[in-house]
Amino acid sequence: MIEGEMEGMINERIEIWKKEEYHYPAAHGFIPVMFSYIHEDEKKHPAMVIAPGGAYRETSPSEAHLPAMEFYQAGYNVFVLEYTVNQLDEAPLKLQPLNDISRTIRMIRFRAEEYHIRPDQVAICGFSAGAHLCGSLCVHSKDVEDPEEAYQNISNRPDAAILSYPVITSGKYAHRDSFVALFGKEPSEQELDYMSLENHVTKDTPPCFLWQTVTDQTVPVENSYLFAQACAQAGVPFAQHVFSEGIHGLSVATEEWLEQNIGQEEGKRYMQEQVQMLAEAIEAGETPFPKEKGEELLVKFGIGRKKPARWTEKQKEGIRKTLKEVQSWTKLAEEWLEKYLEVE
């Protein structure tokens, strides 16, 4: 399943919903799942939940395994969430991803003994749309109920959040496609306001660590500024790091990331289960899409075949020049978390 497994690590695939609890109409048999990176010892560790990005269209493997290993090696027990996405606009997601991450936090706290974690040290780390998902939980946690009675009295509020090149606003600086995936092409004003996170920060929002690059051409850096300003006005502890240069989607910004050694064996589907099930449904004639669309998806995501190269060598050389500055974010975040999670 996952390359780079280390001796003493417990890797499990854990479905977060029972079949009868999960109702997204375009799931095609998929149930959201988390992958664990747990130290095989008796120590109680802080927990980290990773939410990869992908415009709410996919959960990117490049923002999954590598940050999970970074925090695992820093002493965290880590859970990477493959939440519900909307690849082909079959059905707006609405609040399903928010329900997914809320359930994940509650499940981890409920199983704190089993997972060897401290329930008062549960952080979340999201990238791009995954950061929007994490930010949504930070500002709307009180709104999210859970159908499972055992979880209803367990808090879903994270103790701290890392928002990496986050989608934040539905306003002037919005990443529009993320909001189309959530609400369709004709969202209501109420829906857009609810998911414009800078409008909903309160004193109860958990501490947040934000980072982004000035030259991000996909999600404007103003998204981070808007959320940081809202935190400042509400008295929420926060840190903000804006790096001078770098493309969108840098993940941990290492050479390993650049060469796409991202913990996904060639042709495997780690973090791409929903895409594979969609492709299989298309090829079986269970959707309105032409059958060749299924093969197109499998090629695009490298499932069952070699994935096309993401960059040319010349493009990689340009990206490589920006990595040293940006990759410092992981250590900065870990030091910040030690303060706000009171990690020993």
Question: Where are the model-predicted features located?
Answer:
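N-terminal cap/lid segment of alpha/beta-hydrolase-fold proteins
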Residues: 7-43, 172-177
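Short beta-strand element of the alpha/beta-hydrolase
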Residues: 45-53
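Short alpha-helix in the alpha/beta-hydrolase fold that links the catalytic acid
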Residues: 63, 197, 220-231
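Primarily recognizes the serine-hydrolase "nucleophile elbow" in alpha/beta-hydrolase
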Residues: 103-178, 188, 192
